């Protein structure tokens, strides 16, 4: 006998089981449109209520799909935990870990510009932007597995964009570098994002 779909949904939404997921997409990119696009999307969010955050999540997933030709690296992890308190702690740890990289890389790049006399033009042939999506959802199992290919990443982003809104409990969007005038170098990718894998 199969459980009614609504009954399963209600169990997932009311129990203490939470899935915390991180999806990172690295883009080898010459233009600055994706950073400007992300800034624009965030500016449209008037508050941190879940409806607006869910809309932001859908829009970011769609934007990343639009830039699929620039995908270079990916990292995916989705972990289910047995309590909301543990999930919140894990989510905050992941967020802090990623946001710490923003300050570090911005400082390093500023020092490099200073040594060069400032105003230098980046060689964009091997520069990157990394976009990180952190999600806390009411799912009772991981929402995706490991991702190594562009096709799997595309499917995952499409699934995220079609997620049921009531399942979203937390969402954090982080991209590095924050400014459209800055990019990550090969060295930055190796140092700070060495666990990401090249997309096959």
Feature-to-residue mapping (PLM):
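Mid-length scaffold segments of soluble, non-membrane domains
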Residues: 86-109
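Long, contiguous hydrophobic alpha-helical segments, chiefly transmembrane helices and signal peptides
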Residues: 25, 56, 76, 91, ...
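Charge-rich, acidic-biased intrinsically disordered regions
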Residues: 76-93, 184-187
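Membrane-proximal, solvent-exposed terminal domains/tails of membrane-associated proteins
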Residues: 49, 101-200
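Residues that form generic nucleotide/phosphate-binding pockets
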Residues: 37, 41, 60, 90, ...
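N-terminal topogenic membrane-targeting module
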Residues: 1-68, 72, 76-79
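Aromatic- and glycine-enriched beta-alpha-beta binding-site module
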Residues: 63-67, 94-97, 110-114
